[in-house]
Structures are given as C-alpha cells and as structure tokens.
C-alpha cells in the first residue's frame, strides 16, 4: 500500500496537479475525502504557497496530512496543539534532511531577484528535467507513509 500511495502522488503531479495537491490527494480516501475535495483544499499551497516560492508545496501537503492525523479540534486543547506542532516540526526536519531545504525557492535554486508570477510553467519534458518537484512530491509521500507505518496505521 505504501508504494501505491507514493506512486499515486507522483502520477498526480505528472498529470499536471500541483505538488501540494499531489501529496494530499494520494491519501484522500484514507481521511474520508473525495479526490476532488482533496485537490481543492490543497490547491493554494503549490509553488511554495500560491507560487510565492515559500514553504515547498509538497511539504505543505505533508503538513496538511499531519493536521488530518493529529490536529486538535478543541480550541483549549493545548496538549493536542503541541503534539501537532511537534509532529510538523519532526516532518519538516526529515524533509530538510532528505532534500536540503524546506523553502521552494531554495529547492529550485532561484534567486531572490526573480519576480513572483502567478502563471505556472507548461509541464514539458524540459520542465521535469530542470525541477526537483517530482522528487519533493515523492519524498513527502514517502515520509508520510513511513510515519503511518511507524504508528501502525
């Protein structure tokens, strides 16, 4: 099952979905969401959150999954909030260890002077060859599968 979810995330990205969408939608059924719901709720996080090149969208998808698994549902649940923050921090550190950074611009090797644009690039063979995004999606999905396996889920 682990490999199927990882492959599904990569497949979704190669179909043209955003990095964040690909990670979340690969696990949608596990959390009771339809594919469409998962794609919509994670849509804004691609490209480093709204294509602003901040936190990697694949990592954002990973953190959304952490919220679905451990997020608190009571406003006064400080213990639950702390547990969720701890998990997100653990996942972020693992993502950084494997990929060298957490920030989209750093992962892409972009300079700070490049303008932020909202229009995505065409998904061509050249696009996939120059960007590490497929690897980020794969690693985020793998990290989540490993977490679930450790939890016996």
For every predicted segment, state its role.
Residues 1-15:
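Polybasic, low-complexity association/targeting segments
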């Amino acid at each position: 099952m682990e490999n199927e979810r990882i492959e599904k995330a990569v497949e979704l990205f190669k179909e043209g979905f955003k990095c964040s969408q690909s990670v979340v939608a690969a696990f949608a059924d596990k959390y009771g969401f339809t594919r469409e719901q998962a794609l919509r709720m994670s849509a804004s996080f691609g490209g480093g959150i709204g294509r602003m090149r901040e936190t990697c969208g694949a990592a954002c998808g990973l953190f959304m999954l952490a919220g679905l698994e451990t997020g608190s549902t009571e406003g006064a649940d400080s213990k639950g909030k702390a547990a969720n923050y701890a998990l997100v921090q653990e996942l972020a550190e693992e993502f950084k260890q494997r990929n060298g950074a957490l920030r989209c611009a750093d992962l892409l090797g972009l300079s700070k002077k490049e303008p932020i644009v909202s229009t995505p690039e065409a998904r061509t063979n050249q696009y996939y060859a120059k960007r590490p995004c497929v690897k980020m999606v794969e690693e985020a999905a793998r990290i989540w599968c490993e977490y679930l396996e450790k939890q016996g889920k």
